[in-house]
């Protein structure tokens, strides 16, 4: 009950001169956001709010590699599980490697004055970023995956 009483004076405060000067940006932004949805398409504004709730859920579920890490783990060691903390570390590791490879491939494309990153740039960036034997295995697996993809 008390919050409702506080909300009513808050609605009156923008009408007053002094609080309006202090809280005009905050009070101004909230009605604008509320006006944008109903003003856009009347009843569909309510559906727009539902879409926003859907978008919020979409924002919460950030794309991760967790499913794929788990699938690979089960292929290699079917009887072993993984903790959520270890999964988070693995996900961060893959994101880090991905960023390094993407940055290196972008540099290579820029050096060669090419607008497109091709499999050649990716392969070269793998050789530059990953050390020794790991790079060789990654290149062979990548080549195998690309040929499988193109033949399918």
Curated annotation (Swiss-Prot):
Region: Disordered; residue ranges are: 1-59
Entries under SMART domains matching the protein = H2B
Q: What post-translational modification information does the record give?
A: Can be acetylated to form H2BK6ac and H2BK33ac.
Q: Which GO terms describe its molecular function?
A: DNA binding; protein heterodimerization activity; structural constituent of chromatin
Which segments of the protein form a coiled coil according to its record? none
Residues annotated as transmembrane: none
What is a single Pfam family found in this protein's UniProt entry?
Answer: Histone
Q: Which Gene3D superfamilies match?
A: Histone, subunit A (1.10.20.10)
State the family named in the UniProt similarity comment for this chain: Belongs to the histone H2B family.
Functional note: Core component of nucleosome. Nucleosomes wrap and compact DNA into chromatin, limiting DNA accessibility to the cellular machineries which require DNA as a template. Histones thereby play a central role in transcription regulation, DNA repair, DNA replication and chromosomal stability. DNA accessibility is regulated via a complex set of post-translational modifications of histones, also called histone code, and nucleosome remodeling.
Q: What is the recorded name of this protein?
A: Histone H2B.9
| Originating gene | H2B.9
